[in-house]
């Protein structure tokens, strides 16, 4: 259900360039997207889990803030990330 350490490490290397570059906006968005996908499948199976629903909404809001920041700072990196993660339809 949750995103494992190995998955986070792989996403960090893929979007950050190295394993220690965890603060990069693209890495944070990629990890949040993986966690959101995991929570979404959990919510399909457990419709009455209100705590997980709240956690899902918090992660979606955090990802939205980070994407808004990235769009404001560097539109090309934003577009590349959106395309890579298949976000925004």
Swiss-Prot record:
It holds the Pfam family Ribosomal_S15. Signal peptide: none annotated. It comes from the Bacteria. GO terms for biological process: translation. Belongs to the universal ribosomal protein uS15 family. PANTHER family: RIBOSOMAL PROTEIN S15, BACTERIAL AND ORGANELLAR (PTHR23321), SMALL RIBOSOMAL SUBUNIT PROTEIN US15M (PTHR23321:SF26). This is Small ribosomal subunit protein uS15. It comes from Ureaplasma parvum serovar 3 (strain ATCC 700970).
């Amino acid at each position: 259900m949750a995103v494992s350490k190995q998955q986070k490490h792989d996403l960090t290397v893929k979007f950050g360039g190295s394993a220690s570059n965890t603060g990069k906006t693209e890495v944070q968005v990629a990890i949040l997207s993986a966690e959101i996908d995991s929570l979404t499948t959990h919510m399909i199976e457990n419709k009455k889990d209100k705590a997980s629903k709240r956690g899902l909404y918090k992660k979606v809001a955090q990802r939205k803030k980070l994407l808004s920041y990235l769009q404001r700072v560097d539109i090309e990196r934003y577009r590349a990330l959106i395309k890579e993660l298949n976000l925004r339809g």
